[in-house]
Swiss-Prot record:
Organism: Catharanthus roseus (Madagascar periwinkle)
InterPro entries: Cyt_P450, Cyt_P450_CS, Cyt_P450_E_grp-I, Cyt_P450_sf
Pathway(s) where this gene product acts: Alkaloid biosynthesis
Protein name from the UniProt record: Tabersonine/lochnericine 19-hydroxylase
UniProt topology in membrane: Single-pass membrane protein
Amino acid sequence: MLSSLKDFFVLLLPFFIGIAFIYKLWNFTSKKNLPPSPRRLPIIGNLHQLSKFPQRSLRTLSEKYGPVMLLHFGSKPVLVISSAEAAKEVMKINDVSFADRPKWYAAGRVLYEFKDMTFSPYGEYWRQARSICVLQLLSNKRVQSFKGIREEEIRAMLEKINQASNNSSIINGDEIFSTLTNDIIGRSAFGRKFSEEESGSKLRKVLQDLPPLLGSFNVGDFIPWLSWVNYLNGFEKKLNQVSKDCDQYLEQVIDDTRKRDEENGANNNGGNHGNFVSVLLHLQKEDVKGFPSEKGFLKAIILDMIVGGTDTTHLLLHWVITELLKNKHVMTKLQKEVREIVGRKWEITDEDKEKMKYLHAVIKEALRLHPSLPLLVPRVAREDINLMGYRVAKGTEVIINAWAIARDPSYWDEAEEFKPERFLSNNFDFKGLNFEYIPFGSGRRSCPGSSFAIPIVEHTVAHLMHKFNIELPNGVSAEDFDPTDAVGLVSHDQNPLSFVATPVTIF
């Protein structure tokens, strides 16, 4: 019997050797086609190589491993894109293949199981949601209907600055700009100011906490069996509170708007009037074809609009004024352009603004150096695919480092310097057609909100340059600024913005 068993194993030995050889050959070949990758550690993968400022540490790694780099965040494969050419492959050439979103735990909790437009999976629901946002809420006609709101709130801001200047007070720029954007978007979305109601203060706190919460590291997203850590580090508690406060406020707003519209006989059928909530309620009531019936859609879309609008608009204003204060020669040139075009009149029209080429260049340059999303919202590969000669597996998360691309000296002369003149000689815009410059992303999953945010920033900066001379407070110099982007979903500055303003006597 023993002899028979020995003969049996001798006969099987070549078979096992062949299987082992084929496995090793397959394993070698598959690894050979993977993107370059730094060595990873057990359990945590490459998470130890991320700093407090991930866009910076990822750029440093890409300088060594290349513009298409494979990392592992825990057990999750993550492809990092750091060149315009690779970004074009992802967002244009293979746009549909990379059109999904990761199912982040925090996003699912706050956004009603991904019922919003930003994080919803690619498919029919997402197409319906995006169509409603683009055609009903962010169309040129709708945005133009909010012009009066924008002008009223900018005027109120200018009056506050003028009063502070008369008292020789230092102006808290972040507070001024946050109030401005919150009230413009509050009135546009809900028909009410955040700053004039008690419940609005709770929502302001939510809007302050939510973007960093969505963009912060959640260990459970990458190492699922460590999800219990969220109960120890306070993440779960904070997420519960933010979700609860947000839902209560949105429920109240929707109920109040529905009652008000019924009492007034409002008919917000896509005409020139109606805030976002009224428009959505009307579409729901009329059972418009393509309007999603899923519970939570209204709240999730409204949340998309206000979170995407308030924080990014306020931060862009922050960065524009910060860079102008640091670069006085740029501010002088911009003031000259604005004052020559507008003259002695108080109002600044859309026609005036269109003539301000240097203003447009200043805003574009601020967005180049400080994109609202330094790391674009990740995409997910929907299938196995070949990308620039590398094998990318289905389910791989894809991070596009827009911050690194916008500071790449291969595309930009003096890439770290604030030079608006570079945009006077090119036709780059915010549509994501030039992949060296993608502050709002590109392709199917790009952010459609630039048509709403940019006019607010343009008119605000134009009015400030026209009516005031602004400078740093006494004792503060440009060298004191360290414009470091903080961690989170959007690009916050760790340094508060303060300035003094002197009215210009040209009226």
